[in-house]
Amino acid sequence: MTRRMRRKHWMSLLITIAVAVFAYGQQQGWFSAPEKGVMTSQPGLYAIDHFVDGDTITVDMNGTKETIRFIGIDTPETHKPNTPVQCYGPAAAAYTKNTITAAGGKVRLVSDSLSTNRDRYNRLLRYVYLPDGTNLNQRLVESGHAFYYPYFPFTKKDTFKQAEQQAIAAKKGLWGACTPTPSDDGGYKMEETQAQAGN
């Protein structure tokens, strides 16, 4: 075999290996671009330590208990000091608990580049994903268990707003059981007179 033939042979072999590595990397997601505006802050799945209410949970994060506040949504109150249990609050809390429990009791947490890392109560602000990739924040809005929360910046605002509009039109969840009042700043609120309705 001449030197030229040997060189062509090795080049062909290297190209074949490179193609194989690239194909494997594509399959494993090595070259996938991250979702625009969103980064994974805690890779892996975290076990639920406690369900606080519909939009707040605590997780065991490598031996540390962290409270997680769902980004971009707000569920009716069940445990807020000096606030009565609001219409559909218990239903929203039960939906979050039952959905996560049915999925194995573990979640993946994703931060948002437009959002702060923690809120004023030192809770981590996160999108909460089920193991199958379902965004639970969005599902709560779609199913009428939560309001879209427009008061702070986050990348999925338009998606959540559209989900809320569809839930309103279909009278899903709290939109059928309660009578939320539009607030001056683009969101909705529950009047205290509705506190015990629809629980």
Residue ranges and their predicted role:
Residues 1-199:
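Small beta-barrel nucleic-acid-binding modules, primarily SNase/OB-fold domains
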